[in-house]
């Protein structure tokens, strides 16, 4: 539903509203020889990318699997590689800033379970805690979330789902790029 790309040495974000626009951009000749990194891409992103490649291109990618998970995907004709950074950075993305001394960066909170098509353009109160995966968080993380959420609600913060999603994605990509 939304994607962000950044070049390794350039923090400028390239924004895409769907997989088609992202892949059309990525498959341009200027990206030959590039590597595309996604943290935990094996679990979601690479499945969508591979589906696009098979449905909309003539390429037959080389794929390395671990079970049903895509560890690496290569379009040989373009020398374009899709690599899951979890293969060599076996930690949660939220730990990257501290691990790599990027003190100005922090992975924020996002209501992943609220991120469905009918809510893409929602504006209103900060969504309920349940949409943030509250029940699957560590006690420490849950405490941080509650503190953040209560502060947002107390100030009548207007949640703009699309703007928040964009900001969250840019932050994630920036954390990965700079790490």
Question: Residue ranges of each PLM-predicted region?
Answer:
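Metal-dependent nucleotidyl/phosphoryl-transfer cores and adjacent nucleic-acid-binding surfaces
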Residues: 1-179
